[in-house]
UniProtKB/Swiss-Prot annotation:
It comes from Hydrogenovibrio crunogenus (strain DSM 25203 / XCL-2). The keyword ATP-binding does not apply. This is Gamma-glutamyl phosphate reductase. InterPro entries: Ald_DH/histidinol_DH (IPR016161), Ald_DH_C (IPR016163), Ald_DH_N (IPR016162), Aldehyde_DH_dom (IPR015590), G-glutamylP_reductase_CS (IPR020593), Glu-5-SA_DH (IPR012134), GPR_dom (IPR000965). It is an enzyme of class 1 (oxidoreductase). One of its GO terms (cellular component) is cytoplasm. The lineage of its organism: Bacteria, Pseudomonadati, Pseudomonadota, Gammaproteobacteria, Thiotrichales. It comes from the Bacteria. Belongs to the gamma-glutamyl phosphate reductase family. CDD domains: ALDH_F18-19_ProA-GPR. Its EC number is 1.2.1.41. The keyword Cell division does not apply. SUPFAM superfamilies: ALDH-like. The gene is proA.
Length: 417
């Protein structure tokens, strides 16, 4: 196969479809989403049959149990995807929204209109449900989608693509509005991220290695986050019960997610009071603790190294550091944070405002678990990922994050004097 020619063709078709989607009505887009949901339910047995081929191949290739679990399309997963599509259909459509309309002395009206980005390329690993999530968010926001899933889910993704494209056709939209890259040749990724004439933005979802490779080679903007080194700081003026509850949840609610706490910071004045009980809870849960010298003087645990402060564990491991005050906590966060999510536990309004203003992460919280850093929890309905960059989107990327804006100017034969 000529991979370059294949990707160019997909890109051309996506660009053409994006022009139709740009002016599609909310009703058309919602109908398409609902039709995809119905197609998934009607084709559930076919989807499971194709998915079984991926699972069989995955076992032969030595994929571990966790990976196979993420790969599986069960009835529950398929029903969940259909439900998600219907939920996205129920969300407000951001496209065409007009804001900040002002009359100016020159006689013109100037405002902003929300518009799609165009063609969104999404590169991801393992989970075939991302195919549906990505397609749904792109369609609702008026974008064409070019999807490149992992080779381990090739059969599943092709089957899902058939459901999507038949539903698009039935809805009066171009089936090429959502295309799955069917070749497993890795050269396809290199071509996909180097087609600025056809692709407007790339969103990689997967491990750090994948995201770094995409970022380094892309010739189009990339929406991404590399790490989730999240912190919780227990302040001098923290409520002890709140501190214990939040710090425990932020670490133990789920380990392998980017918004789990990886480092706990605690003010020296509160360490001896709060740490013993909290450490006992962590140990009962099976969390391995690594502490600074002051922490280890209070509770017995492994010594933390310099590397620990800069590590996203994605595992039941936690680093703990005692700091003098909020200034030292912020300095530590500034040095080691990945810019994802940080939280302060305090009853002091002045300190909380200082923390909110000075901590430069995509989500900054007061008296809340870092586990809330999620598009659904933020009321966005769904998310395509989380961005720790400052352009174009930051934080959980929902429908609005997949849009841009243009200025609109209204006159009445108005000329510039």
């Amino acid at each position: 196969m000529d991979v370059k020619a294949y990707m160019q063709k997909l890109g051309q078709q996506a660009r053409e479809a994006s022009r139709q989607l740009m002016v599609a009505t909310t009703r058309q887009k919602n109908t398409a989403l609902l039709n995809i949901a119905t197609a998934l339910e009607e084709q559930a047995e076919t989807l499971k049959t194709e998915n079984a081929k991926d699972l069989e191949q995955g076992k032969a290739n030595g994929l571990d149990a966790a990976m196979l679990d993420r790969l599986a399309l069960t009835d529950k997963v398929i029903n969940g995807m259909a439900t998600g599509l219907r939920q996205i259909a129920a969300l407000n459509d951001p496209i065409g929204e007009i804001s900040d309309m002002n009359y100016l002395p020159s006689g013109i009206q100037v405002g902003k209109m929300r518009v799609p980005l165009g063609v969104v390329g999404i590169i991801y690993e393992s989970r075939p449900n991302v195919t549906i999530d990505a397609a749904a968010l792109c369609l609702k926001s008026g974008n064409a989608a070019l999807l490149r899933g992992g080779s381990e889910a090739a059969y599943s993704n092709r089957a899902l693509a058939k459901c999507i494209q038949s539903a698009l056709h039935e809805s009066g939209l171009l089936p090429t509005a959502v295309q799955v890259v069917e070749t497993t040749d890795r050269a396809a990724v290199g071509e996909m991220i180097a087609m600025p004439e056809y692709v407007d933005v790339i969103i990689p979802r997967g491990g750090k290695g994948l995201i770094e490779r995409i970022s380094e080679g892309a010739k189009v903007p990339v929406i991404k986050h590399l790490d989730g080194i999240c912190h919780v700081y227990i302040d001098d003026d923290a409520d002890a019960d709140k501190a214990t509850r939040v710090a425990f949840n932020a670490k133990t609610h789920r380990y392998g997610v980017c918004n789990a706490m990886e480092t706990l910071l605690i003010a020296d004045s509160r360490a001896a009071e709060i740490l013993p009980g909290l450490v006992e809870l962590y140990e009962e849960k099976g969390v391995e603790l690594r502490g600074c010298e002051q922490t280890r003087a209070i509770c017995d645990m492994k010594a933390a190294t310099e590397e620990d402060w800069a590590t996203e564990y994605l595992a039941p491991i936690l680093s703990i550091k005692v700091v003098d005050d909020v200034d030292e906590a912020i300095d530590h966060i500034t040095q080691y944070s990945s810019g994802h999510t940080e939280s302060i536990i305090t009853e002091n309004l002045t300190t909380s405002r200082q923390f909110l203003a000075r901590v430069d992460s995509s989500s900054v919280m007061v008296n809340a678990s870092t586990r809330f850093a999620d598009g659904f929890e933020y009321g966005l309905g769904a998310e395509i990922g989380i961005s720790t960059d400052k352009f174009h989107a930051r934080g959980p990327v929902g429908l609005e994050g997949l849009t841009s804006q243009k200025y609109i100017v209204l006159g009445d034969g108005t000329i510039r004097e």
